[in-house]
Amino acid sequence: MLASASLLAFASSRPSRAAGEPLPAPPVTPKIPVTITQLGRARVDDYAWLHQPNWFTSLTNPSSLNPAIRRHLDEENAYCDAVLAPTASLQAELAREIAARSTDAGGDPPSPDGPWLYWSEVRPGANHPTFLRRPRNGGPDQVLADFDVLAKGRGYYRISNIREPMHSPDHSLFAWAVDETGDEHFRLYVKDLTTGVTAPAIERCFGDFAISPDSQWVFWVYRNDQSRPTKVFRRSVRGGPDVLVYEEKDPAYFLTVRRAASNGCLFVTAFNADCSETRIVSAADPTATPRLAEPRTPGLLYDLEHWGDHFVVRTNAGGAVDFKLMTAPLDDASRQAWRDWKPAATGRFIAEVRAFQSHVARLEWIDAKPMLIVSGRDGADRTVTVDEPAYALELDPEAEYASNEVRYSYQSPRTPKHWVAYSCPTGVERVLQSQTVNNFDRDRYEVLRLDAPSADGVLVPLTLLRRRGMAQPGPAILFGYGAYGDSLLDDFSPANLSLADRGFVVAKAHTRGGGERGRSWFEASLKLKKKATIADFIACAEHLVRQRLAAPGKIVAHSFSAGGILIGGALNARPELWAGAVAEAPFVDVLNTLHDATNPLVFSSFPIWGDPARPEVFDYIASYSPYENVHAAPYPAVLASAGLLDDRLGYWEAAKWVARLREKTTSGRPILLHTDMAGGHQGADSRAEVIARTARYQAFAIRAVSGIWDGAVVKA
């Protein structure tokens, strides 16, 4: 069975404690009061000492971590392991189920490009993918990179998740970026496929890169000492010195680089949530100074796609909140040259555009559902429809520009992933490949899409997966995020089936702050409106109870990163509503983090959360920040995770929050912290580790809804 040895080793390595034994005593977090005065407002932080002042040093040199902090984190890990020890067999069982259902790891179907077919697959027993190709007209497979082999002997290994072809346009090179330490400082490698020689690694890459259209240069984004993407360099694919292409001096902006699908140019883009600016690198002369398209203007967002003799511009210009499409000539991509092509339509959010030789494909979100729309050069639109109440659609990022087909994937919470080719001339679709899932019968499950009324009357989309015939109301797990305009995809998860088979309703709350209902849905939770996200999440939980889909007090909340605001706020506002909460690398110490100029995300975050240097923003953040608002209440069981090398949301966020929750809770339910002492924000992505981590969270959720932690039901 896939990765079974690793998974069983994970379970058996945990400390043993029989079910029914008393809970061990939690670590005592010393209270060292620190008074923080800002804008004439004073507050006391008893756990500020957990935030090491020179924390960036510990990212590159973990041994420099204050011994008292390390000792505390080790004690928290030991306590977490001891409390969860009675679930070891359950974790192993869940891990086996997830692995068994996930044995079809063939990856995406081969993508044609010129004379080759490219694809990746996770081979039986492997933890990382292998990238391959073979001649389009037939011939043997060629291994481009076997990441399971490359990861051998490394404690941490994560491949950069870029939506770019990793091979060069002339098919002579293959490039990849990997984080080998957990601090998200990627190394970029370029391999000559003719000789098999890999050039010396490019250090301190942010993860984004693109090979130039002439296949002579690799363009990459540099990560500085503060972990910010500040420069774009180019280097010969054969090695040599780095040449500065562009430097971004405003810390409020991120940088990215990508090659046009047509190979007609490269785009270097500086952006944040409020503004963007793109420079064009000519395919004819990749060493020339990039040409600015349209200078940055506050509130103006745009991006470009190269399409034949002009650019397609996706933009919010002219009040197009949900974006529109315009065109611009190749020799003048400034705003004054933009011309309307596809006008804005209220409630139709244009999320993504991809140009092909004879057509343009775009993804639009309409009423919290993605739609695929294809336009020819005559401007006529064709819409690909899906007959399910909730689902996910994604465009193939490596689709061939010269093709007359649009390749996309489709899935839903009860429908495994299907890869489909849509013929632009005929409108006929053909299924390229379907994900095979063992021990799974689609008809045993159903998907529902509901609308939960929030406190202000706004209807919040709510997606549910449940197994047919299960008694209700029962337990539920509610996922949420609600930040940065990112949409929670209604995708297929083999892991969620294990919960559904145990009577759980698996739900996703599409709260404001996400992008499911367009840019306006995102903007409805910005700055002085952030509490809408928390209210929406609570409303979704209440709706589950009201519709008798979940039992009162039997709901587990689950989120990640910026979703910590959503979970922490919901626990503070309605602690009795929840049986438990899983908070992965949570953003919960909002006020302190936004005042920390050493955090690489702070300045770019002001368009999202607001600038706390302004009194009204400070006071508003202080009124919802989870850490600041923990109070004496019957909190549910909590499992928080952190990464010691996380440079986005430091380990201390979760550690301080857990300490304050444990100090204030009146319920007796365990408040747990697990810190990956060798990991960062994302965690390791080996197959065995991902499955084991998921099994731990699920076992915690099952235990939480049982209400039994020490052999007796814990009363609120």
For each predicted feature, which ranges?
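Active-site-proximal cap/loop segments of hydrolase catalytic domains
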Residues: 509-716
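Beta-propeller folds
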Residues: 2-5, 10, 19-405, 411-417, ...
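Active-site lining segments that contact anionic ligands and/or coordinate catalytic metals
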Residues: 263, 275, 299-301, 308, ...
